[in-house]
Regions:
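Bacterial Sec-dependent N-terminal signal peptides
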Residues: 1-28
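Long, intrinsically disordered, low-complexity segments
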Residues: 20, 105, 184-186, 208, ...
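Membrane-proximal, proline-rich intrinsically disordered regions
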Residues: 20-66, 243, 401-403, 617-633
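Conserved, well-structured interaction surfaces
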Residues: 39-58, 79-152, 168-209, 214, ...
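Short coil/turn linking the two alpha-helices of tandem helical-hairpin repeats
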Residues: 149-150, 156, 227-236, 502-505
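Short coil/linker segments at helix-helix boundaries
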Residues: 154-175, 232-262
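Flexible, polar/acidic helix-loop-strand segments at domain edges
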Residues: 327, 333, 353-354, 358-369, ...
Length: 633
């Protein structure tokens, strides 16, 4: 089979310049449907079009999860960008900031329906090829429905596309109850799994990467069931007055604990399938170093490679419809020396202290729980020493907060005087302790370039910059793009730990097993050992509630800056308590260390109950009065 990847790229470019109204009764491709299924070549292009309908994970203005929880922010000059406006709580039903209801996803679902109806008649495809493509498109259809459900709550499942001659009244659909929506999505995925049509292992990776595998189907099912079991969708009495036209609750009002058991079984099955397919956690041995590195630098680079090392063994499915290219990376990158060209590293994206402080100490427990960590003085100054030379420049001052942190802190974040190995023609020294680092105090080479090109908090999301992106010289950069990692194994392992913990009366070895796999890869000891030896709450891992907090924090750390926290904080219903806060950083306008390392407000974040779901655009309700608006909008 020809490579579908190139067709995906072309389709992605096309979808960016087109739109489609969900209520249009004429399918997008009705005029060319006969041609679309003429032969193998046109069908492969159509399949790529279906894949291109996925939400653009790497687009900060169309992915609500990048800035939606403000785990990352833009500087104030770009605070009016749609993504930031969404995160700051300025969405509205009359002018929806990120609108998936009117276009895009429903259009993609219609494309999927058309594809499944038409591909069966293509003569130069064998039956295996047809069934595989149908399974792929059915999984795409399930994914798009799930995304809509996660974002809007009750949706209008598009089981079949309406005929072209359907009346206006006939296409005016109703929102269905949440449980019915979830049930339909699970049924779609089960049909895919039961068909056994998706490959366990790609036989020709160069032409198949980016397509769905059996592992992806099982992980998606596990994720859907995990969400269905979570507080937002399971017995959510906050929506007791949100009723459909028949006076029935859109959200079930009685908590069902057995859903966690079902989710746990699905997660374990997904883990088993992934293991049989060779999916595993990315390790230090997977990172190819050109020079001998210290264990510290090697681990940091490997943890960066988890995200940006293309098609690495941890990736279950990467979104080739949304590539992390120079557009996003340049906003996360910085300068390592004086440059005469200030258009390479735009450095608009920053990580606030609320995210920075989540990462564990080097003992693998929260810094506010570590009995040995100088938490009270974390904003004070400390000078880099030989012990920390692979993380912080020796002899330079930075905050206590940046010392004695776990390896994921240093792989995820760049900071003033913090080592940043690689990514430059002169940044792979024989002794990696001599690698370059940002200098970000006012007037230094990493501080503001052109107007608006500065880091607002003093922390860069280094994680999102490819390990193979590099300065060719002081003034030019070669960017290496990579597909956004929408499904990866570490996420699945933590999902498994969460579902198991919630399904049991108290955590046990099975719960610890899955979270400890992720921690071990990050260079940390197991949960029980770490809390027993260093935490001022040594018994926390022994209770269901304690492990819930630990697992949630582990997800916030392991998946930081990947847009996962936005969805997690919604399904856990923790956003209301966590996201009414000051967004803070360092005083980036100061030139001395004493003045720079002063906690400084950047934004005020607000969140209310209505923000758990986005509003249906008012224009859609005008067109279809049968749609009921989400509460609060």
């Amino acid at each position: 089979m020809k490579s579908i990847y190139k067709y995906m790229l072309c389709a992605c470019m096309a979808v960016n310049v087109s739109s489609c109204d969900f209520l249009d009764v004429v399918p997008d491709n009705v005029a060319t449907e006969e041609h679309a299924f003429a032969d193998r070549y046109t069908v492969e292009k159509y399949l790529a079009t279906c894949y291109s309908k996925f939400p653009a994970s790497a687009n900060r203005n169309s992915n609500p999860a990048i800035f939606g929880a403000l785990e990352m922010v833009l500087n104030s000059e770009y605070s009016t960008d749609k993504g930031m406006q969404y995160g700051l709580g300025y969405d509205s039903s009359t002018s929806a900031l990120i609108n998936f209801w009117s276009s895009g996803l429903y259009a993609g679902i219609r494309e999927c329906n058309t594809f499944m109806n038409g591909v069966v008649n293509v003569e130069d495809l064998n039956e295996y090829e047809k069934q595989r493509m149908i399974a792929e498109v059915k999984l795409i259809k399930a994914y798009l429905h799930f995304y809509l459900l996660s974002y809007y709550g009750p949706i209008c499942p598009l089981r079949e596309s309406p005929p072209v001659n359907e009346s206006t009244q006939g296409v005016r659909v109703y929102r269905e109850k949440v449980d019915d929506c979830f049930q339909y999505i699970v049924e779609l995925i089960d049909e895919v799994i039961d068909s056994d049509a998706l490959p366990l292992i790609f036989t020709n990776p160069t032409t198949e990467l980016g397509r769905f595998s059996r592992s992806a189907a099982y992980m998606l099912k596990a994720k859907v069931l995990l969400y269905w079991a979570s507080p937002l969708f399971n017995g959510n009495t906050d929506y007791n007055s949100f009723l459909n036209h028949n006076g029935e609750h859109f959200f079930n009002q009685i908590y069902d604990p057995t859903r966690w058991t079902v989710a746990a079984e699905a997660c374990k099955k997904a883990v088993d399938i992934c293991e049989s397919a060779g999916v595993r956690l990315y390790q230090m041995s997977d990172y190819v170093a050109t020079k001998k590195l210290s264990d510290q630098t090697l681990l940091v680079q490997a943890l960066r490679g988890v995200i940006s090392h293309r098609w690495n063994p941890e990736l279950i499915w990467s979104n080739t419809a949304s590539v992390v290219n120079s557009s996003l990376q340049t906003e996360c990158f910085t300068y390592f020396e004086t440059s005469t060209s200030l258009s390479n590293a735009l450095q608009k994206m920053s990580v606030p202290l609320s995210t920075v402080e989540l990462f564990y100490s080097n003992h693998g427990v929260p810094i506010n729980e570590d009995r040995t960590y100088d938490y009270a003085n974390r904003y004070s100054l400390r000078t880099g020493d030989a012990e920390h030379r692979y993380y912080i420049q020796e002899g330079e001052q930075t905050a206590v907060l940046n010392f004695d942190r776990e390896p994921r802190f240093y792989s995820t974040l760049g900071f003033d005087r913090g080592k940043w190995y690689g990514n430059s023609y002169k940044n792979m020294p024989d002794d990696d302790a001599e690698c370059l680092y940002p200098k970000n105090r006012f007037g230094e080479y990493s501080s503001a370039g052109n107007p608006g090109q500065y880091n607002a908090t003093g922390y860069w999301p280094k994680k999102l910059v490819s390990i193979n992106t590099t300065y060719r010289d002081a003034n030019s950069i070669t960017w290496e793009s990579y597909p956004f990692p929408d499904m990866r194994y570490a996420d699945l392992l933590l999902m498994c730990a969460e579902a198991l913990n919630e399904s049991k009366d108290a955590p046990d070895a099975e719960v610890y097993k899955y979270i400890d796999m992720v921690r071990e890869r990050a260079g940390l000891n197991g949960v029980v050992e770490s809390w027993s030896n260093y935490s001022n709450h040594p018994d926390k891992p022994n209770t269901k509630e304690g492990m819930r907090e630990i697992i949630q924090n582990e997800r916030k750390i392991e998946l930081a800056c990947e847009g996962v926290y936005y969805w997690d904080s919604h399904r856990w219903k923790t956003a209301l308590s966590e996201q009414n806060r000051l967004i803070q950083g360092w005083n980036i306008n100061a030139s001395s260390a004493e003045d720079y390392y002063v906690v400084t407000p950047v934004y005020t974040q607000s969140f209310t109950y209505k923000n758990y779901f986005a509003p249906i655009p008012e224009s859609e309700i005008v067109k279809n009065p049968q749609l009921i608006q989400n509460p609060g909008w």
